[in-house]
């Protein structure tokens, strides 16, 4: 039986678990009703329909990511060269990683979608070198966006855990040379990755939708924008990163789920 969400003062030290460790969807979730949702959500009938499909239908996981043509070509050509791969936001990109047999870790805020990705990989490949990490940021809608967007104390704690999710109980041997930022909290995820890879000489961070988002420019303070592949930005390490400054920026952008 799934336990109710923890109260503000009882949040566990970590809020990330492997997708394979998640309990089955309980019958109680069928009790999910209108009384539990705020009016702002009730006004969105499409969201109610999405939540139902999210829980009771089998999502179709694509074989390739939904990048534009240039981004897709770059990602597809770069993956076979990677030794260790990290991504924020699972989906077709995870399938590409599994096919490449690269060691990988994927983080997602939608447990139902993440479970479907893992099941597809297990079914098609039997096993993988992957680690599937679910980070609970609260109930989510399409693309793993939090439904409840007001930054309450409890939500802030949860949101700040998302960029840190792949680094909790970190295996020192897991130092990715290729990182895709295509989930939530993209600036904070990029900056957190840069911080943890400070001593790594060579790596690439790919940030999708970069060309459309002026707020993502903060990343350029801490990494070199090497090229644009369509709407995808390719970053490489700077020679020096001021950790105090990057910590302050992470604190700020950990509350921005875009």
What is the predicted function of each stretch?
Residues 70-74, 91-93, 161-169, 191-192, ...:
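A generic local structural motif
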Residues 1-66:
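Membrane-proximal basic amphipathic "stem/tether" segments
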């Amino acid at each position: 039986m799934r336990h109710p969400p923890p109260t503000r003062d009882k949040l566990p030290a970590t809020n990330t678990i492997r997708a394979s460790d998640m309990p089955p969807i309980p019958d109680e979730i069928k009790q999910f009703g209108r009384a539990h949702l705020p009016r702002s959500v009730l006004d969105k009938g499409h969201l109610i329909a999405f939540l139902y499909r999210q829980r009771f239908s089998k999502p179709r996981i694509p074989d390739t990511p939904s990048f534009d043509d240039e981004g897709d070509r770059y990602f597809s050509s770069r993956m076979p060269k990677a030794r260790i791969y990290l991504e924020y936001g699972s989906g077709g990109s995870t399938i590409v990683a599994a096919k490449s047999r690269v060691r990988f870790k994927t983080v997602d805020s939608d447990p139902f979608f993440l479970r479907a990705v893992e099941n597809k990989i297990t079914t098609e490949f039997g096993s993988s070198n992957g680690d599937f990490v679910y980070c609970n940021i609260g109930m989510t809608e399409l693309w793993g966006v939090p439904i409840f967007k007001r930054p309450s104390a409890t939500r802030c704690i949860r949101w700040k855990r998302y960029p840190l999710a792949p680094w909790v109980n970190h295996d020192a041997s897991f130092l990715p040379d290729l990182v895709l930022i295509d989930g939530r909290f993209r600036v904070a995820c990029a900056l957190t990755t840069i911080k943890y890879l400070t001593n790594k000489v060579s790596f690439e961070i790919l940030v999708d939708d970069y060309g459309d988002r002026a707020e993502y420019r903060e990343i350029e303070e801490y990494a070199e924008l090497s090229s644009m592949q369509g709407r995808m930005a390719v970053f490489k390490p700077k020679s020096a990163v001021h950790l105090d400054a990057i910590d302050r920026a992470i604190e700020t952008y950990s509350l921005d789920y875009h």
